[in-house]
Regions:
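A short, charged helix-loop
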Residues: 139-188
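Accessory alpha-helical DNA-binding modules that contact the DNA backbone or grooves
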Residues: 169, 174-231
Length: 231
């Protein structure tokens, strides 16, 4: 139990220190906590994130006990933030934290927003007034590119070139087409290429043709695909 108490204490220590650090570094004037609810996506696609349930079911008895203590501590932390500070705490029974963050950004278009998360999906929200900070990698993602803690541009480890600024529209389009294995979402077009060939249209060509909706847009996916469960 003492070992578990130490883990919980360290987790709270790291959490509060992290909040203080980003508050000071980014000169914040308000903090918003967005919490998970049951996703509405499960009502439309039952297998959504089922793989995570499988992982939970495989936990040992000790891991289950530790998780119970963790969630009890989390509830206390949430109540403290909600009742004893001026932070905003958002939660909805059918929305994920991602949905709430996107909604907050969209409903406050005149404010500058810093999303503190390691989740790559938030690159879809990047805009002149929206940046993301990955505290693990110490990387800031803005509409101008990726920057390290010293303000230098981050280079792609594979190409050695500077990582270009994310294109939110492209990222959303690619995610919709390729699916997301981490969320157990099947690809809408299995095996689709990023760049097309002489005989097949790729994602890049279709994306470039999305406004005029010409040949590439209408000929990228000529079949209907279903996953192994018939969705």
């Amino acid at each position: 139990q003492s070992d578990l108490d130490s883990k919980i204490g360290m987790a709270l220590h790291i959490t509060f220190n992290s909040i203080r650090k980003v508050w000071q570094d980014f000169k914040g004037d308000h903090v918003v906590f967005c919490l998970e609810g049951r996703s509405w996506r499960k009502d439309f696609y039952e297998p959504y994130k089922r793989n995570r349930k499988n992982a939970r079911d495989a936990r040992t008895e000790k891991e289950v006990e530790e998780d119970e203590v963790f969630w009890e501590t989390f509830d206390n932390f949430k109540d403290f933030i909600d009742q004893k500070t001026n932070c905003t705490v958002l939660r909805n029974d059918v929305l994920e934290a991602d949905d709430l963050i996107a909604g907050w950004v969209q409903s406050h278009p005149n404010d500058n927003h810093f999303i503190i998360s390691t989740d790559g999906d938030f690159a879809q929200l990047i805009a002149p007034n929206v940046a993301q900070y990955n505290g693990v990698q110490e990387v800031m993602i803005t509409h101008e590119g990726y920057f390290d803690a010293k303000g230098n541009r981050v280079k792609d480890k594979k190409t050695g070139e500077e990582k270009p600024a994310p294109n939110p529209q492209w990222l959303l389009f690619e995610k919709c087409m390729r699916g997301d294995s981490s969320d157990n979402v099947f690809s809408a077009y299995p095996g689709v290429r990023t760049k097309g060939t002489k005989t097949k249209v790729g994602l890049q060509e279709a994306f470039a043709d999305r406004d005029s909706k010409g040949y590439s847009w209408n000929n990228m996916m000529l079949q209907r695909w279903v996953d192994h469960e018939g969705y």
